[in-house]
Regions:
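Rossmann-like S-adenosyl-L-methionine
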Residues: 28, 188-442
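N-terminal chloroplast transit peptides
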Residues: 1-17
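Internal alpha/beta scaffold segment
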Residues: 114-157, 162-163, 184-212, 219
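Short, aliphatic-rich beta-strand segments
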Residues: 160, 169-186, 247-251
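Cysteine-cluster motifs in flexible loop/terminal segments that predominantly coordinate metals
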Residues: 28-64, 83-84
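Composition-driven low-complexity segments enriched in polar/acidic and proline residues
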Residues: 73-96, 155, 161-164
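Residues forming anionic-ligand binding surfaces in small-molecule and nucleic-acid pockets
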Residues: 43-46, 102-121
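A short, glycine/Asx- and small/polar-enriched loop/turn
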Residues: 83-87, 100, 174-177, 422-423
Length: 442
């Protein structure tokens, strides 16, 4: 299929020339379908807090607080596409009001009433195609939607992850393929579940990369049962690429950034702050996208990367990424430790020049903050790269690091990972002070 040559839907937010924004999309090797910025589901759907056609759709309200905190007019914010950026989507399966058939979408704001959103301007066109294919199967086989009030019904959620064999950013590949996961209201895989999966695969053809099942019969709002994954068809794992093109693999239940354009830009910028030949530790690593990105940057020539992650479920994907590294030298430089970051903070900061932290929304644990601000901290550690998805917790952590006198904030910028929401990712660099709190650990 020849990609259609269509103009990207790019919005220039306040104070940013449209020409500057256009350069972002010009780097892409593929194209995506043009879509209208206005969304018919807004404001009922809870996915966005700002209309996509608003002038400030790419300036989340929290950005004003970010700029005020840093007090620096030079604070830079990366804004990518306003539409078609989402390459991973989880849609609830509930009953269509008129027919009772399966409908897919997000919940209306402040409720658990479904707003059908199978067409969504922020989602990759493949997400819409996967939703339509899944619904066709549900209609043909009489699949019943989950009913929260009774706990009955078969299908609870559908997850779609877009994966491109060609592009670094799947959002720029109209021919990206879909990995579809079905969350069934059951605790055992049945032949019917398999028939539903295989019907989706048959209808989707080459478009469907793989189909998996998650068995979740708990009466709760938790979407996935992390012990309930079953691979049924095709490829089990998906992947994103590092800026160098190296594949980093993900399981269906792995945490994965939904906006590969913005995440890829973060990965491209981080190496600027890593000295050549560094020993790197990545805490809260997940499957290791940041660490593997630094490892495969030939200009950095990092000596080692240690990945620290609390969940053992990442090991299978991490090992596949390691095994596909291009040579034994790179493979020998990586290691994975399954442990809570705060439990091994002291040992992790020894023989470490650069510490990467990408914590959950709550930020760094108090005990980890104590280690990083204690005068006995290993003299090896000279740089902290902090990726934050929760600005309030970042402010607390940054204030403590700087107040200790041991760390200086030397760089800060932000990234809009979720356009039209009140969410911002902050990337900050802290350098070790040379005159306070330096003590050689023997």
């Amino acid at each position: 299929m020849t990609p259609r040559r269509l103009i990207l839907d790019v919005v220039a937010p306040r104070g940013v020339p449209s020409t500057a924004r256009a350069s972002t999309s010009a780097r892409a090797s593929c194209v995506v379908s043009a879509v209208p910025r206005a969304c018919p589901h807004f404001p009922a759907c809870s996915g966005c807090v700002t209309a996509l056609d608003a002038v400030d759709a790419l300036d989340p309200p929290v950005l004003e607080a970010v700029r005020e905190y840093f007090g620096d007019d030079a604070h830079e914010t990366f804004r990518g596409r306003a539409t078609r950026w989402r390459c991973k989507a989880k849609l609830a399966a509930r009953a269509e009001t008129s027919s009772g058939r399966v409908a897919l979408g997000l919940f209306k704001r402040g409720t658990h009433e479904l707003a059908p959103t199978e067409t969504c301007p922020v989602s990759h066109v493949g997400v819409e195609r996967a939703a339509a294919t899944t619904r066709a199967t549900c209609d043909a086989l009489g699949v019943t939607p989950y009913d929260e009030s009774t706990g009955e019904g078969e299908l609870r959620y559908v997850q779609t992850v877009m994966c491109s064999d060609e592009a670094v950013d799947p959002g720029m590949d109209e021919d990206a393929r879909a990995a579809i996961s079905l969350v069934f209201n059951a605790n055992t895989l049945t032949r019917r579940h398999e028939e539903i999966c295989m019907d989706i695969a048959r209808r989707g053809g080459d478009f469907v990369r793989g189909v998996s099942v998650n068995l979740q019969d708990a009466r709760s709002n938790v979407i996935f049962n992390h012990a309930g994954w079953v691979h049924v068809y095709g490829e089990y794992m998906t992947f994103l690429r590092t800026p160098s093109g190296q594949r980093v693999y993900y399981l269906p239940g792995s945490f994965m950034q939904a906006n590969p354009e913005a995440y890829g830009e973060l990965l491209r910028r981080m190496p600027r702050h890593v000295p050549r030949g560094s020993r790197v530790v990545e805490m809260f690593s997940g499957v290791g996208a940041i660490g593997f990105s630094l490892l495969t940057n030939v200009e950095l020539d990092v000596r080692s990367v240690r990945f620290v992650e609390s969940s053992s479920s990442v090991a299978e994907a991490w090992e596949r990424t390691r095994d596909e590294l291009p040579n034994d030298s790179l493979k020998s430089r990586v290691s994975l430790q399954i442990a809570k970051a705060e439990k091994i903070a002291v040992e992790s900061t020894r023989d470490c020049d650069v510490l990467v932290v990408d914590p959950p929304r709550k930020g760094l644990d108090e005990s980890l903050r104590r280690v990083l601000t204690d005068s006995t901290l290993s003299d090896d550690l000279a740089t902290i790269l902090y990726v934050s998805c929760g600005f309030d917790s970042f402010k607390r952590d940054a204030d403590e690091l700087v107040a200790s006198g041991m760390w200086t904030l030397t760089h800060h910028e932000s990234f809009v990972f979720f356009p039209a929401t009140n969410h911002i990712e902050v990337f900050a660099v802290f350098k070790r002070s040379k005159t306070i709190g330096r003590k050689r650990n023997g």
